[in-house]
Regions:
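Short alpha-helix
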Residues: 176-191, 197
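A short SAM/SAH-binding and catalytic strip from SAM-dependent methyltransferases
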Residues: 121-137
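Class I SAM-dependent methyltransferase SAM/SAH-binding core
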Residues: 73-120
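Short, conserved SAM-binding segment of the class I
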Residues: 137-141, 145
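Conserved Class I S-adenosyl-L-methionine
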Residues: 196-282
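Conserved class I S-adenosyl-L-methionine
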Residues: 1-61, 63-72
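Conserved beta-strand signature within the Rossmann-like core of class I S-adenosyl-L-methionine
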Residues: 147-159
Length: 282
């Protein structure tokens, strides 16, 4: 049990201030240009396991409208629209929105999805995109926008950019994220009653040769891990196997490579949902 003093300290702590200090110490946040460069890798031509789990937890009512803030290329917006929900899909990356437009046209969802070029400074909703400098500000905007239910997802172990199994195997250091703890406590201080559910989404990285695999995975070797490149090459050489689905579209629509690693990369997410507490909503 938590005694009275500890409980009072938890409730009075400046969780958002501490969050902002942590963000200031992190590497530079990715801007729209960085996400523009990644857009070519996002081609959501099928509903990924993450999207299916997210939609199940979101538990929307039939035809309920959704604001998807940080929509990217539409990994959530497209399946939501296919399920009959009107979606306002907002992102600050023009290239991501261009990829979303292609998906909208491909599936004939022009009457279901409304793309908007917006950043967190404009309006708020989030699936995997709530990690901003001012977390309380983002959560407050989301709370004020939603009429019935708010939901965010945040990483509950290592960043999706990293393969935790591989990094541990080669002795590379990695910092696991606990941002969802800050979000939960900030929401409590806002007067909300957040519910947290954890789920995992699998990821399978594929490549066409050993050197291509090393080049791909070496992006994970940063923040002092650059000297682990030889260990990385040895690990991939020992654990690369034939990909039985080589050439087929992957979860992002890009053709899969000839090889893959002999383990599935898993990302753990914290799904946080709550009823809006802001007053003055219609």
């Amino acid at each position: 049990m938590v005694d009275g003093d500890a409980r009072a300290e938890l409730l009075s702590a400046d969780w958002n201030g501490e969050w902002m200090r942590l963000q200031a110490a992190r590497r530079r946040a990715d801007d729209s240009f960085e996400w523009d460069k990644r857009a070519r890798h996002f081609r959501p031509l099928e509903t990924a396991p993450y999207a299916r789990d997210f939609m199940k937890l979101l538990a929307l009512k039939p035809s309920e409208s959704v604001l998807d803030m940080g929509c990217g290329a539409g990994s959530i917006a497209i399946p939501l629209a296919q399920a009959g929900h009107p979606v306002i899909a907002a992102d600050f990356s023009p290239s991501m929105l261009g990829t979303l437009d292609a998906g909208i046209e491909y599936y004939g969802l022009e009457d279901r999805i409304t793309p908007l070029e917006l950043a967190w400074d404009d309006v708020a909703f989030a699936s995997r995109s709530v990690t901003t400098t001012n977390l309380k500000g983002a959560l407050t905007k989301l709370d004020r926008t939603a009429r019935r239910r708010c939901a965010v997802t945040m990483v509950a172990n290592s960043s999706p950019r990293y393969d935790l199994h591989l990094m541990n195997a080669i002795g590379a250091s990695i910092t696991c994220s606990n941002g969802f703890v800050y979000a939960f406590n900030i929401l409590i201080q806002m007067g909300a009653l957040p519910q947290v559910t954890y789920f995992e989404s699998p990821r399978r990285d594929t490549f066409d040769s050993l050197e291509a695999g090393v080049a791909d995975f070496s992006r994970m070797l940063e923040h002092g891990n650059e000297d682990k490149i030889d260990r990385l090459r040895d690990y991939i050489a020992q654990h690369m196997i034939e990909n039985p689905h080589a050439g087929e579209p992957g979860s992002k629509g890009v053709p899969q490579g000839r090889y893959m690693l002999d383990h599935v990369r898993k990302v753990r997410w914290a799904f946080i949902a709550w009823e809006p507490v802001s007053s003055g909503r219609p």
